Amino acid sequence: MTHSPDLKGSSFTLSVLHLSDNEIAKTVEFLQEKVSQAPSFFASAPLVINIAKVEGDIDFTALKQGIADAGFIPVGVTGCKDKRVQNLASEAGFAIMSASKSPTQAPAKMAPTKIVRTPVRSGQQIYAKDGDLVVLAHVSAGAEVIADGSIHIHGTLRGRAIAGASGQQEARIICHDLQAELVSIAGDYWLSDQIESEYWQKKVMISKAEESLHLETLTI
């Protein structure tokens, strides 16, 4: 019995680059810097470009090439103000995208919490699909812990923690000692140099609200 291909709708969490102007060189330099800071996270990552705030025409061909040269995969453009801009982006090979509405399907049934009792070492990746992740040890630099739900680290976080990987906005990251290379919740992320010094090496909880991350220290 042969099976035909099946085309279904789905949703993914993608990084979105919000442009403030049409200076391509500045944008490419910014992306190259991000890749150099966290190459395993950003290299060959799909990228959507939001141009809603850009005044004036954009050289979409140069933009697409620059994004690819920086190590990303240009997926599409959102925020086009009119049909003419859409056509220019489309002619350069960009898909024209629009922000999705709130999902109407029922949320995925959460799986049991995944518990890791040993240190997560450099080069390792741990993923808790459809559930929360608890690490009862340290997460080393160069290691990556990912969960569709929340992440709890009962030790030092020196690597990367990515919660809400399937888009769960209510996900949290809790760790006993924050020294992370990168933290991310539902597609929004901070690199180490974006984490305020008052929270460094502290017990913290990271959450997301109004499309940005929030940090608070914990005393228990």
Curated annotation (Swiss-Prot):
- GO process terms (BP): cell morphogenesis; division septum assembly; regulation of cell division; regulation of cell septum assembly
Transmembrane portions of the chain:
none
Q: Which keywords appear in this protein's UniProt record, sorted alphabetically?
A: Cell cycle, Cell division, Septation
SUPFAM superfamilies noted in UniProt: Cell-division inhibitor MinC, C-terminal domain
Under InterPro entries, the record lists: CAP/MinC_C (IPR016098), MinC (IPR013033), MinC_C_sf (IPR036145), MinC_N (IPR007874), Septum_form_inhib_MinC_C (IPR005526)
The record's similarity note reads: Belongs to the MinC family.
Assembly: Interacts with MinD and FtsZ.
State the function annotated in the UniProt record.
Cell division inhibitor that blocks the formation of polar Z ring septums. Rapidly oscillates between the poles of the cell to destabilize FtsZ filaments that have formed before they mature into polar Z rings. Prevents FtsZ polymerization.
- Name of protein: Probable septum site-determining protein MinC
In its UniProt entry, the species of origin is given as Vibrio campbellii (strain ATCC BAA-1116)
Q: What phylogenetic lineage does the species belong to? A: Bacteria, Pseudomonadati, Pseudomonadota, Gammaproteobacteria, Vibrionales
Gene that produces this protein: minC
